[in-house]
Curated annotation (Swiss-Prot):
Cytochrome c oxidase subunit which plays a role in assembly of respiratory supercomplexes. GO terms for cellular component: mitochondrial inner membrane; respiratory chain complex. GO terms for biological process: mitochondrial cytochrome c oxidase assembly; mitochondrial respirasome assembly; regulation of proton transport. It is a multi-pass membrane protein. This is Respiratory supercomplex factor 1, mitochondrial. It comes from the Eukaryota. Residues 89-162 form a coiled coil. Associates with the respiratory chain complex III/complex IV supercomplex. The chain crosses the membrane at residues 35-54, 64-86. PROSITE patterns: HIG1. Keywords: Coiled coil, Membrane, Mitochondrion, Transmembrane, Transmembrane helix. Belongs to the RCF1 family. The keyword Ligase does not apply. The lineage of its organism: Eukaryota, Fungi, Dikarya, Ascomycota, Saccharomycotina.
């Protein structure tokens, strides 16, 4: 059965986290807590610079970069914990948002059902109207046949009286 388009249709680009693939989840989580990926990149940069310093034999610079790594890793961990705390405090707010979205979806479904029922009523009204016109046409046809018969009867009387 083909789907009837409706004025209530619209595309929902919002996906549930469980429906997302790996890259979409990664981007979604990075947008939720932007400091964590930045901290990870900075920590990785500090490790790379420390490794280069160790290879070149510069122990003092390597030590500084390893200290930076520890500091950046700690900052990333703090950002992660703070973000999860903030994110969990917004959980109740998100729940109400989700409930509003569910209510909106139910409302859209109700409107869609009402629109389908309205269309069905219109179709039924057209069907009844067409049937009524067919009956009237049949009645008119029968009436015209009766009039033709009466006319023939009158013509035969007129011809008989001449």
């Amino acid at each position: 059965m083909s789907r009837i388009p409706s004025s209530f249709d619209y595309k929902d680009n919002v996906k549930d986290v469980s429906e997302m693939d790996f890259m979409e989840k990664l981007v979604f989580r990075a947008k939720q807590q932007p400091l964590v990926p930045i901290g990870c990149l900075l920590t990785t940069g500090a490790i790379v610079l420390a490794a280069q310093s160790v290879r070149s034999g510069n122990k003092n610079k390597a030590q500084v970069f390893f200290r930076w790594r520890v500091g950046l890793q700690a900052a990333t961990l703090v950002a992660l914990l703070a973000g999860s705390y903030i994110y969990s405090s917004n959980k109740a707010e998100r729940k109400t948002e989700e409930q509003l979205l569910k209510e909106k979806a139910k409302m859209r479904e109700q409107l869609w059902i009402q629109e389908l029922e309205r269309r069905e009523q219109e179709t039924e009204a057209r069907r009844k109207k067409a049937e009524m016109f067919r009956l009237k046409a049949k009645e008119n046809e029968e009436a015209s046949k009766n009039l033709e018969q009466e006319l023939k009867a009158l013509e035969s009387k007129v011809n008989a009286s001449k």
